[in-house]
């Protein structure tokens, strides 16, 4: 709602130390992150909130384990947790994260808006009644770390032989960033 005002509420966000540069400033030359930073500032001003980023560690698994331990031991003051999907998803089963579809969390969220990655979020749900992870324009890491390899079938065949060998390499676990 346009008149929504959180009256200076502090939003505590757990984040890996390695990613604070993306969220804490607009400098650094990355146009996407500069836009995210500016958009977050607009939201903060409109809703009258301040973000406090709580840095944990560099390691994805250490970050998730610390955050989940804090939450499950009632030591947590986090309002939002930024985790890597690979390590974070399993922790929803441990009861560490709130179901965003519960009214107390979702009453101001319109998950039908185009800035949410609805297909991505749908793929991370356990049922139609649960949602533990959000993804959208505010966190472009979801798409910035996605990768795909395209190759010209005919050129590959001419220089390296059977293109199906590439698929077999992947299927057999031999694919690396160097190979």
Kindly give the residue locations of the regions a language model identified.
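Conserved N-terminal structural module of periplasmic/extracytoplasmic solute-binding proteins
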Residues: 1-95, 157-167
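Helix-loop-helix "hinge/cap" segment bordering the ligand-binding cleft or interdomain interface
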Residues: 45, 87, 92-95, 101-179
